[in-house]
């Protein structure tokens, strides 16, 4: 939403192992300026922001293969970006060099001007155009039943409630309809 008072609007649910210990959204005493949920097992986050306007989120990628437990937690990718000063695009391109050190992931990173997507299951990062994008446990904008349903719903909300879409987006996220597991 370039030129808008709120240029980036993210609506997300945490789709994780619920038994994994975590803290809800809050500021991090040990990393001033960072806000997000916190993975108490590995110390990172699945979604975070920094007071300087940086934002990042990571999802696991389902491959159908056994998880190999890479040497670093994917949640640390988010923290590394939030604490850095590289643009979203530069960070994504630099991360490609060691992206295979992690189990499958998608990363969305926002530097205040541009939104980048990177997956270690794809050939190269992308800077995203304005619009509605969906991300689950495959590549960006993959046509899965749940992401297709959300894309349609989010598009309707943004068209009907562009002045204040948050309440309607939260209502969409409350839908607990379970899609068939086709992937």
Task: Give residue spans per PLM region.
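N-terminal nucleophile
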Residues: 1-183
């Amino acid at each position: 939403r370039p030129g808008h008072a709120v240029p980036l609007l993210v609506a997300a649910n945490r789709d994780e192992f619920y038994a994994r210990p975590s803290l809800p959204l809050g500021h991090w005493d040990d990393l001033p300026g960072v806000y997000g949920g916190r993975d108490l097992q590995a110390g990172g986050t699945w979604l975070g922001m920094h007071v300087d306007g940086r934002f990042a989120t990571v999802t696991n990628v389902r491959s159908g293969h056994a998880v190999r437990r890479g040497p670093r937690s994917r949640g640390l990718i988010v923290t590394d970006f939030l604490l850095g000063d590289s643009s979203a695009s530069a960070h994504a391109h630099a991360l490609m060099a060691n992206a295979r050190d992690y189990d499958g992931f998608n990363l969305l990173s926002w530097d205040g001007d541009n939104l980048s997507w990177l997956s270690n299951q794809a050939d190269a990062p992308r800077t995203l155009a304005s619009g509605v994008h969906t991300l689950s446990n495959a590549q960006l904008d993959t046509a899965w039943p749940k992401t297709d349903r959300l894309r349609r719903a989010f598009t309707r909300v943004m068209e009907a409630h562009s002045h204040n879409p948050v309440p309607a987006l939260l209502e969409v996220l409350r839908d607990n309809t379970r899609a068939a597991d086709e992937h």
